């Protein structure tokens, strides 16, 4: 008889069936999964449904899926109830190497299952977690350990170890420094410093200090202070004005004009000095970079000079007196009388120009003409002014310009004929 086939476990058969179904779906719907057409997507869904659920209707498949979800939720609820009734087994507690076990609260004591009592190496103080202090960046923990590690707690081996470390050759070669470790600073600046941070420069054996000196300010704190210290331009000006004090020279028109003239003269003198210095450097051959204008200013004879390869054109330097201007341009000279400096009143009131009276008089004349044109009455003073003006015009012309009027131009008969013509006239559009 042939040997019997070994029965496979149920879990493995389910996984194999699931893989077979996925393989069939991939073969039958090859290239259709990512198609955008509605027909292709409908066909893809139908094939996957048939392979997974057989000839079941979609409603039945949805019901089975919902039933499975409900079963999973029921199992979770049962586990929670069992955990509440019977406390679960707590995993063995682990701590990092070198850490003090008394600084960690016992996990079994939290669940009320610790039976060791005082012999337990972990702490049974639940408030210990809230008492943990923040690690200070201004204190090196190694210094505190050295202060607490006194000779009263040493034995012979510890004493020999300390002597060898303190007076050994390796310790003598090792330089003593107060420089702060760069890895320590980088960790603080980048917010990476914490309880589990280890110095990449050697850990606890790092020769540099892992503590900030007193008064040290980090870069991120400096930026915050700079932002807070920024003030507006107006506040800065007022602050500087207040710092001057009362014993200062008051700015008036006279002192301002004197200051302006002095500054202008200083500017002119400085320009002349620079020109003389550059001219001397040019003559001495020290000037390496000069402009073409400066060359002709320093040596005017170069204007009439001619090179060997130049053409026969001769350039003349005009004086400006005999030159003829074909297109005359109207030039208005600047009247300096218009720019007379005036002191401003301290109360802030602006000084009006004297021309306002002439403009006001011209406005009054225009108003009088407007009232005459509209048929308004004229005052006696205005009438006298008009008569005087008319008399002046007559005297200037010598002869009074008058237009003769024909009184018999339009008689009654002419007006009657005009009305008849208007009545009998046919108007065309």
Curated annotation (Swiss-Prot):
Cellular localisation: Cytoplasm; Nucleus
Q: Does the keyword Cytoplasm apply?
A: yes
Mind telling me which PROSITE patterns this protein's record contains?
ZF_C3H1
Provide the GO MF annotations for this entry: zinc ion binding
Record field: transmembrane: none
Record region (Disordered)? 1-28, 56-75, 301-327, 362-415
Specify the signal sequence span: none
Q: Which domain of life is it from?
A: Eukaryota
Locate the coiled-coil region(s) and give their ranges: 59-87, 219-285
Bias-annotated ranges (Acidic residues): 384-396
List the residue ranges of the region (Required for interaction with DRG1): 237-261
C3H1-type zinc finger span: 100-127, 175-213
| A GO cellular component entry from the record | cytosol
Q: Which UniProt keywords apply?
A: Coiled coil, Cytoplasm, Metal-binding, Nucleus, Repeat, Zinc, Zinc-finger
* Composition-biased stretches (Polar residues): 1-11
Compositional bias of type Basic and acidic residues: which residue ranges?
14-28, 65-75
Q: Output the InterPro entries linked to this UniProt entry.
A: ZC3H15/TMA46_C, Znf_CCCH, Znf_CCCH_sf
Q: Might you name a Gene Ontology BP term for this protein?
A: cytoplasmic translation
Q: How does it assemble?
A: Interacts with DRG1.
User: What the protein does?
Assistant: Protects DRG1 from proteolytic degradation.
Per the record, the similarity remark reads: Belongs to the ZC3H15/TMA46 family.
Which PANTHER family does the entry link to?
ZINC FINGER CCCH DOMAIN-CONTAINING PROTEIN 15 (PTHR12681:SF0), ZINC FINGER-CONTAINING PROTEIN P48ZNF (PTHR12681)
Q: What is this protein called?
A: Zinc finger CCCH domain-containing protein 15
Q: Which organism is it from?
A: Gallus gallus (Chicken)
